[in-house]
């Protein structure tokens, strides 16, 4: 089939101006709820493609335009192409090569981490000439993303790949997808209900590794605070679990308090402003997101507490974050790749072909879990090696205590 590869790949409801603002490093998300035609029927896919083609207008942006600031150099640069490997070319379903449409429901696109995930989705789709993707922007809003999933079902997409804004809030939408018989692949953060497959790195073991670096840096004694990701999201829950595991092994570390940083900078500044008044001694800040760590550092500088030597241990895995490690702003950064969308697309296509997912296993939630390999924490010893492999094309903020 000869056609433009992006003709029907649209971001619905995303303004380019919002994206350009987000690439400055102040975005809200990081990382981490109808009936439809038969999943593999040509009628359903054709109606979905037609609906996507007709969906133009105010506030919509072409995928290529949204990805103009992307950093992925090509398919071979993706870190997990050896997981569920799939040959390039048309996808066969029951001996035929029907047009297939994957619906991608993203939390939002106001952070480069989320755009990087889209890059990996698009990279896989472009390898298969009979596969298209319709991408919807949830605007970091549970109601909007719920409506997006319902929209994809109404369009008759063949499968849905979703990265939910919140683990409980998207349960009703996920239930409707499963009830409609549409394969549902969930990325990065889980939905606490049935789904075909959940794909993600272990936030527990990643946070545990970062927390171990913190315990070692503090020689097993000190007072810490924790800035979480969005409360209720599965990455925030799991990163707190990893920290708790490490603290159980380090009785000399005292947790002073914890607060919801929402993955972004501004709430972290407010939290740290308050804590610096309440606690005369803080030895380290354990943050779930780099943005939170940068925000905490700003608050420390404004409070005149730079001389306290407060240490920072964080997560996200951006090139900017790794640079902050190299320059001494952070002492460790959890290595969490957004380039997992290609795995989600491959899994969805395998499910449409009736295949089982290799290495997927039952876990403590309904459905199956494909756990991705752990990546090492980035520390001053290996930061230079990892900077070129981090996501995002933006500079870290200047160290306010330098």
Language model features by range: what are they?
Residues 167-205, 223, 318-326, 330, ...:
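Flexible loop/hinge segments that line or gate small-molecule binding clefts
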Residues 13, 48, 52-100, 235, ...:
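Hinge/cleft segment of the Venus flytrap/periplasmic-binding protein
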Residues 137, 191-213, 226-230, 258, ...:
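Short beta-strand elements at the ligand-binding edges of bilobed clamshell
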Residues 159-178, 243, 261-323:
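Hydrophobic alpha-helical
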Residues 23-35, 42-45:
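Bacterial lipoprotein signal-peptidase II cleavage site
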Residues 89, 145, 199-224, 238, ...:
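Hydrophobic alpha-helical segments within soluble ligand-binding/sensing domains
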Residues 106, 110, 121, 208-258, ...:
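An alpha-beta-alpha
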Residues 52, 56-92, 101-120, 124, ...:
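Extracytoplasmic "Venus flytrap"
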């Amino acid at each position: 089939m000869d056609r433009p590869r992006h003709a029907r790949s649209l971001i619905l409801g995303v303004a380019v101006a919002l994206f350009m603002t987000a690439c400055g490093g102040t975005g809200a998300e990081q990382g981490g709820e109808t009936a439809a035609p038969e999943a593999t029927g040509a009628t359903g896919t054709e109606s979905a493609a037609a609906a996507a083609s007709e969906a133009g207008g105010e506030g919509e942006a072409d995928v290529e335009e949204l990805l103009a600031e992307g950093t992925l150099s090509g398919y071979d640069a993706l870190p997990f192409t050896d997981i569920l490997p799939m040959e390039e070319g048309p996808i066969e379903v029951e001996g035929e090569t029907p047009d297939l449409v994957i619906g991608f429901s993203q939390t939002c696109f106001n952070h480069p981490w989320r755009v990087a995930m889209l890059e990996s989705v698009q990279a896989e789709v472009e390898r298969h000439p009979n596969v298209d993707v319709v991408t919807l922007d949830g605007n970091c809003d549970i109601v909007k993303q719920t409506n997006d999933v319902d929209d994809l079902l109404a369009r008759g997409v063949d499968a849905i790949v979703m990265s939910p804004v919140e683990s409980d809030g998207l349960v009703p939408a996920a239930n409707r997808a499963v009830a409609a018989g549409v394969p549902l692949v969930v990325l990065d953060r889980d939905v606490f209900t049935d789904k075909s497959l959940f794909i993600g790195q272990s936030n527990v073991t990643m946070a545990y590794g970062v927390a171990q670096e913190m315990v070692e840096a503090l020689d097993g004694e000190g007072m810490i605070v924790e800035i979480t990701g969005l409360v209720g999201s599965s990455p925030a829950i799991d990163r707190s679990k990893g920290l708790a595991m490490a603290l159980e092994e380090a009785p000399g570390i005292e947790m002073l308090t914890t607060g919801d940083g929402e993955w972004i900078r501004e709430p972290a500044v407010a939290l740290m402003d308050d804590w610096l008044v309440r606690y005369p001694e803080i030895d380290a800040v354990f943050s779930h997101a780099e943005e939170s760590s940068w925000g905490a550092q700003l608050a420390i500088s404004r409070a005149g507490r730079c001389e306290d030597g407060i240490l920072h241990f964080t997560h996200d895995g951006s090139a900017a974050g790794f640079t902050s490690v190299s320059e001494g702003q952070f002492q460790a950064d959890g290595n969490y790749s957004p380039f997992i969308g290609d795995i989600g697309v491959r899994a969805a296509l395998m499910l449409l072909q009736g295949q089982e997912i290799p290495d997927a296993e039952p876990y403590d939630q309904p459905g199956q879990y494909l756990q991705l390999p752990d990546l090492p924490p980035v520390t001053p010893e290996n930061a230079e090696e990892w900077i070129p492999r981090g996501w995002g094309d933006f500079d870290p903020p200047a160290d306010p205590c330098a």
